[in-house]
Amino acid sequence: VVTTHKPAPRHPRMCAGVAGRAARALTTAVSALALAIGVLTLAPASAHADDAVPSQEYFSYYHLDAARQKGYTGKGVTIAFIGGPVDTSDPALSGANITDKSRCTIQDGPKGLRHSTDMAIILVSPYTGVAPDATLYSYQTRSNDTQSTGTCDTGGEALDSMGKLINQAVEDGAQIITVSMAVPDTSDELKWAVANAISHGVIIINSAGNSARDENSTQLARWSGVIGVSAINSDGTFASYSSWGNGVVTAAFGGPFNTINPDTGASATARGTSISAALVAGMLTLARQKWPNATPNQILQLLVHTALNPNHDWNQQTGYGPIDGGALVNTDPSQYPDENPIIDKPGGSSPTAKEIQDFT
């Protein structure tokens, strides 16, 4: 997430084409893990600086007030968030259903703690969360802001490896796993953890990165079946900071997001594909609530068939197109085949369909 100097948030512009349709959406090896959080400058205090819980532009962009009025709140769905510790004392998370399911505990720095807390806010905040009634399980893993690995290194074994945490989330009953950090791990442990998640119908989401380049080789989205998410601006254009690659499946609003500078406590705004990934995870949570009888494969088919690129054509920047949250809850996925549409990614990916079948 890149924190930048921005004025108070405005209502998103409702442009024609892709941006207009998106804005109308909900009305009709572990040590290599790197969490990219760059603070550039402080933002001025916004109109909501004195409020305990600031407003968020994505809430109006995706018309989440209308979603809540229709009963789309994620009730009955469990999300797993893999990242740093979450500060559940944050006012925006008051009343949220969050359980720390970590296999061990780390000591994170202020940037990492703020980042993870912001992701939880996007997912399940009763005030500005996409899926306020969903259950959130959090799993701690180290990042480049980690100050101590705490209890996570035991006898030479890393208890917080991405593969172990994905397997743990699957075992704990999560239906959606979201990861807003780079994961350059290419181990067999992670490969088979992804296969395990797919075979159990668990959907995995991963941010594309914020380096404005092809980051496919350093992202979890390089693996078969994982939804890579890039960022768009509020006018629907591809965000200049967003990374891309063969693992990208969709895109979503990447900011501004109203947050707090972790070093000073001052109001700040942030942008990044971490925000986009959390929004996609939240909207897929609403789809799983709305369509409980659909298979996870059909939910994935729904995502790619309703994404907003013309004819849903795929490209490295936005995948099949920006997510259309409205279509996810208004289009019956039972019309689509029970086949995972993102197993064989462009350029090839692992595990293969046969490996997943053999694993099962």
Language-model features, listed with the residues they occupy:
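Solvent-exposed loop/turn segments at secondary-structure junctions
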Residues: 84-88, 104-106, 128, 142-146, ...
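Secretory targeting and sorting signals
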Residues: 1-49
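Substrate-binding/access-modulating region of protease and related hydrolase catalytic domains
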Residues: 145-221
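N-terminal domain-start motif of subtilase-like serine proteases
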Residues: 52-78, 103-108, 324
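Subtilisin-like serine protease catalytic core
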Residues: 68-79, 85-99, 107-155, 224, ...
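Extracellular S/T/G-rich loop segment that most often corresponds to the catalytic His/Ser-adjacent loop
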Residues: 218-289
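Structural recognition of the beta-strand scaffold that forms the well-ordered cores
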Residues: 78-83, 135-140, 170, 175-180, ...
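C-terminal subdomain of the subtilisin-like protease fold in secreted/lumenal serine endopeptidases
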Residues: 291-360
